[in-house]
Amino acid sequence: MNIIDSKLNFKKDKLLVRRMTEAIVLHHSCSKGQTVQQIHLQHLNQGWSGIGYHYYIRRDGKVYSGRPQFAVGSHCQGHNKDTIGICFEGDFRKDKITQEQIVAGKELIEYLNESFNKKLKVFNHGELYPTMCPVINLKEILTNGNY
């Protein structure tokens, strides 16, 4: 799995270590053309330690590192302590997910399952928190209903 190191600087004193990992939560960025660095800066300006997602998948299918994998995320209120957050570039209210993103998303889920040596549950953000994110059923698209 090729994951591009985004070389992001975090407020280390605010990063908490995740003790267990049970699931993956899928998101869309709600914007097109936004880089992982721009999201990181936006989240820093909100007072967070940095980007809340662990991975960011651009429309070309390139996967970028976000928040360190060992750290508690900031992407799904009430479910950050035991989940990994994956964000897909795009506003899926009007943009279609690209085939490159689908392939990269499937590969990333398999990579994470191997990394944690178990089959992680997969959720759309809206299944765990009242939001329209990610608008489309990413879970079904990426897992063929097998999670």
Which residues does each predicted region cover?
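Basic/polar, cationic surfaces and motifs that engage anionic cell-wall
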Residues: 1-25, 62-63, 68, 79-82, ...
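Secreted/periplasmic proteins that engage bacterial cell-wall peptidoglycan
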Residues: 15-70
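A broad, low-amplitude sensor of folded, mature protein cores
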Residues: 35, 55, 77-80, 86
